[in-house]
Amino acid sequence: MPLEFGIHAASQIGRATGKPDDPAAIDRLVRDLQGAGSFVVREYLHFLGEPADPEKARLLRPADRLRALTMPDHWYADGRHLDLVLCYQPEEPDIAGWLSFIDEVIARYGHLVRYLQITLEPNFPIEWIDGSSPGILEALIRGVPHARRALAAAGYHDVALGFSVAEPAEWLGGDEPFWAALAAVPPAEFAEHIDYIGLALYPDAFSPVPADAVADLIRHGITHLRETCLPQAHLTATTPIHLCENGTPTAPDRTPAEQAARLETMIRTIASCAKSANITVYELFGLRDPVSANPEPLTQLGITTDDYTPKPAYATYRTLIGELGAR
């Protein structure tokens, strides 16, 4: 089953920030990766509420991002599809503000968006991720149908709507209460509005994992989501999974060649599961390191260094897109 491939092309990752993004370099590299097919580009917008956390406001620049993304509007042509993630991270619950934010985003970017994701990993309660934000379940459960109505009112009937999770649960200490909460929501109020589920898988990015264990961890994460979690939320096998975030870093104990080999294992494993698990989209995280000299995993997830010099994983990804991608 061919996959639609894509990438997170900007380099801001939570607190990890480095040199400013270079739109010309992004354009050159994405065009090279894309080839003649379609290609997904993932971007993030943040609702921080009032008053916003000062550090998040400084690094994430939500007002600036609501005006302009990393690349200009006209760039989203020639088969490039915008996957826009709306993150909910206020200091206090603010559902009214969140719903207004969704409306603002649709008014500004609805004409560009192909995939609209409501919340980022609401099952994952760590800082800088939506699962740690007060009111997150209500933000998800009310945000999805609100976005559907807003899209329909604006005439954007081709936008696919979803949310993402990080799985499997044992990597996170368990997320049973999250899925139980979705199980309690009548399908007409939530599940029937969902066009896809995003899955973030980083089996070897944040803990030591031998290379020969990576494929099994990928398969387990996909199977756990499809067979254990989604049925609880009234989401059937006909609802596609997007591998919306996946990557493996270079590190002091992982060479660029090893990064490339692990990435190939991950992508080939995901592709082998695509038909049985109904996986339709794969997005790599990400294009460029925020800070290549920093040994932290988040700062070296790129397939290019922080000056856009390709690592071996860049050529690997390009080859896999040509081999496994939808044309």
Model-predicted segments: where are they?
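Hydrophobic faces of well-ordered beta-strands that scaffold small-molecule active sites
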Residues: 3-9, 39-43, 80-86, 114-118, ...
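Active-site groove signature of glycoside hydrolases
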Residues: 104-135, 160-169, 201-203, 242-246, ...
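Short, acidic/polar
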Residues: 16-33, 94-107, 173-187, 260-272
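Aromatic-rich peripheral "rim/lid" segments of glycoside hydrolase catalytic domains that contact
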Residues: 4-32, 55-60, 75, 122-126, ...
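Aromatic-lined carbohydrate-recognition surfaces of secreted/lumenal glycan-active proteins
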Residues: 8, 87, 136-180, 230-251, ...
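Glycoside hydrolase catalytic-domain groove-lining segments
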Residues: 29, 59-65, 155, 187, ...
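Substrate-binding cleft/loops of secretory-pathway carbohydrate-active enzymes
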Residues: 96, 167-198, 254, 258, ...
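Aromatic-lined substrate-binding rim segments of carbohydrate-active enzymes
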Residues: 26-109, 132-164, 211-218, 235-236
